[in-house]
Amino acid sequence: MNAWNGDDDKTAEAITYAQRNKIRIKPPRFRHSKAEYYFDAEERAIYRGTSSIKFLNEGVSNELYDMRDEELNSFVDLLYKLKDTGINARQLEILIKLGYFEEFGNACELLKIYNLFDFFKNGEAKTVAKSKIENDNILFGIVSRHANETTKQFNKLDCHAILDEIESYIRTLQIKDLSMKDKIANDMEYTGSISTITGKEEDRPKLIILDKRMLISNRGKDAGKPWGVAITTQSLGSGIQSSMTVDYKQYCKEKFDIHDIIYLKKFHKNNRGYFIVDNYERIFI
């Protein structure tokens, strides 16, 4: 896999092969992932390398891995530490969207915290005009507790204290994570394959649509008309990919698009060895 960094098709093929042989592919995660893919024999798992992520490079990947033993009490603490590395805003946002920092919270929570970190000039702001935050009573109150106040602005900001309180407040909001479809789209955009796999038995029948193709009849009175839909799927629970066929009339009752998720209720294998979907429903998670 390391030899194919940057080749999305080859990497996707290798990942599919590994999954079919029951070798788990673990997504990039802070404290665990190195720049390159590596195989953990004890866990029988391959950890994705962070340098395989678009716009990431080996230098930044190694800097992140070097931080694996850092004692960090919050995401804000991490953001301050990251200022000493070469990571840029685009790279950081991509990692957040991919769940790389999930130990600190879900992607939507962390993006909100990061946006405010950026608003306060990467935690270094000395002043802020009241007019910029007067429409946010919570933020206005937090800043007022950690700064001096004049008629038009707050100055002598204790940014770290402000951002710590902001993070604590955001965690009370119970902000929902990205939808599964958004996570899948992010996986595809930034890594070229889907690493969103839960490992849960109950999620095995939940199938991500990777590809679909209309099957057209070429004989008889129905020539030129579609009779079925050939689909390639990936199990959300196991990561295993499969090829199946859906009857066109059934498809018309509940259509789906690429990266949608369907719940497979019933299927069979016909006498030609093809898997036929008998019943399914499109789900939103």
Where are these regions (language model features)?
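Noncatalytic, beta-rich nucleic-acid-contacting surfaces in large DNA/RNA-processing enzymes
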Residues: 1-285
